[in-house]
Regions:
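Short, polar/acidic, helix-capping and beta-turn segments at strand->helix junctions
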Residues: 2-114
């Protein structure tokens, strides 16, 4: 999975619905998606070797009362939707905490060209 790191720093830290707004978490999920794309492209030999996104799982570090995990996950899905033609399946899961205090983590399964 990828957390929202840019230039070695998290773009936000804390629980969504408490320290992190849903809008900031949406943007953090976009960063996670781009980081996942970069990691997969490196393994596959370039972004042009990635045919499509199959599945996206978005973990959202949520305050006890936050129930908008799907809106945060839209940050990743919307990003992939702009880059790939075919839709993907997705899960959005609320969790108590993530590594380094990240507000979200995105796990992606890509299909590489054969």
């Amino acid at each position: 999975g990828q957390i929202p790191v840019v230039d070695g720093e998290l773009v936000a830290t804390g629980l969504v619905g408490a320290e992190v707004s849903p809008q900031d978490a949406y943007r953090a999920a976009q960063v996670c998606a781009l980081n996942a794309l970069a990691a997969a492209a490196e393994v596959a030999g370039g972004v042009d070797q990635l045919e499509r996104v199959l599945k996206v799982t978005v973990f959202v570090a949520s305050s006890p009362t936050f129930t908008g995990q799907a809106s945060v996950a839209n940050g990743a899905s919307d990003t992939f939707g702009k880059l790939f033609d075919q839709p993907h399946i997705r899960s959005a899961v609320g969790v108590a905490a993530l590594p380094l205090g990240a507000p979200c983590e995105v796990e992606v399964e890509f299909l590489a060209r054969s």
